Amino acid sequence: VFTAATIANRVNGCVNAPSLIQRVIKRCIEKGAAVNLDAYDKNRNLLYNSLKKFGFACIKPEGAFYLFVKAPVADDKEFCAQAQKHNLLLVPGSSFACPGYVRIAYCVSYEQIERSMPAFEALAKEYGLMK
């Protein structure tokens, strides 16, 4: 029950924008606020291309601000714990009803993603992903 409630909260509260947030966003757009989609595209490309180069399996997203990456071990929570030792914050896919995967957001600065690449490379080597 707890797991189901946690997933429902994440889906309803994080993935599907509540109506209040939608109204706030509408007002922001009407007042001229804009999102720099080029920055998200640049971040996505760096993260996706680097993870693929390091041997991680993932699909390039076409509209999200995060990647779902196949964990190199069956236990996605174990993989997230190991990544944390490299100062990488990944979310277990099982938290989104996608066990065996991890979610990595790229709605941060480009420089932060650049700085994380050595840690992702070390993690990939640790799991024997790099050829």
Regions found by a protein language model. Give the residues of each.
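PLP-dependent class I/II
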Residues: 1-131
